Amino acid sequence: MKDSDKGRLKAAALKYDREERDAPHLVASGSGRIAERIVEVAREAEVPIVEDAALVSALLALDIGEEIPLDLYEAVARVLAFIYKVDVGSR
């Protein structure tokens, strides 16, 4: 996920493995050059990138490794559903 706020790129990366954890957790976040690198790595790995300014702002408040809070479940579920749809459609 990425967001350009006042010209400064912001990005956050989530991981979700049902067998590993109960909820998605933050694996990377940052702004500026760090955000650019997060987006670059995602593109290289062919990971879908979703833009959601409100969600990325909320995710930037989390610590790396922290599971998303309940109030973000719905927004993250929409992102995961979109990614699943894109992934299935590309097969």
Name what the model sees in each region.
Residues 1-91:
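Divalent-cation
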